């Protein structure tokens, strides 16, 4: 059978989006791995699946697969594309959309200028909820990699993140250190690794090594986690503008227990069909 799909991106973080509300198919990890290959498939960072909800309090169910076939809990840039997609496909007429993910409910607001704001909910810092192996909760933790200690913040935005402060993201060892942090035994479900360079109280540069995808042009949950870490440690104040390789995201966070609000673009690239 042929499935219709849409290729989209949020600041270069690119997605294949499937509507399984009006189409019916059983998508497996092997399909994400096959389609995600940039040489022999469609090529993407993540596969986003739109499903009808089981929960009557939400509008849609949102599933995410990495290009390596692993299913993950959350994707912030994908959430913005999800909102744009369901409106463009007339699956809803709402501009405020409630969506159920593996990690909980998020709220998407589509603005008149095409930007999309995502209420990501409050960040989680308790190590067991990230999950992260630590004796007690702290603002920062020493993490040993190849005999060297690195100071990291550990936070969950529905998915796990480690955040490191660096002097210059251009020379940060993202491709060397990123995969080692991703697969560190203290992160039992692996982790996304963010490298943040603080410019001033409201601006920073960021690169993210994503779990199961490698370095991407942008990572929405990574931007949220980096902003939360920077504000928590007193490096920055809300609101925060983060410049990633693919462009800029705006993050607002009022403090512990409060939701993180992320705003940025969502772009449709092309429509296609793929054989299942």
Swiss-Prot record:
Q: Which domain of life is it from?
A: Bacteria
Q: Which InterPro entries match?
A: DAP_epimerase_AS, DAP_epimerase_DapF
What molecular function terms (GO) are annotated for this protein? Answer: diaminopimelate epimerase activity
Q: Active site annotated at which positions?
A: 75 (proton donor), 219 (proton acceptor)
Q: Which SUPFAM superfamilies does UniProt cross-reference here?
A: Diaminopimelate epimerase-like
**Compartments, as annotated in UniProt:** Cytoplasm
Q: In which pathway does it act?
A: Amino-acid biosynthesis; L-lysine biosynthesis via DAP pathway; DL-2,6-diaminopimelate from LL-2,6-diaminopimelate: step 1/1
- What GO biological process terms does the UniProt entry carry, in alphabetical order? lysine biosynthetic process via diaminopimelate
Q: Which Pfam families match?
A: DAP_epimerase
Q: Which family does it belong to?
A: Belongs to the diaminopimelate epimerase family.
Q: Which protein are we looking at?
A: Diaminopimelate epimerase
Gene label: dapF
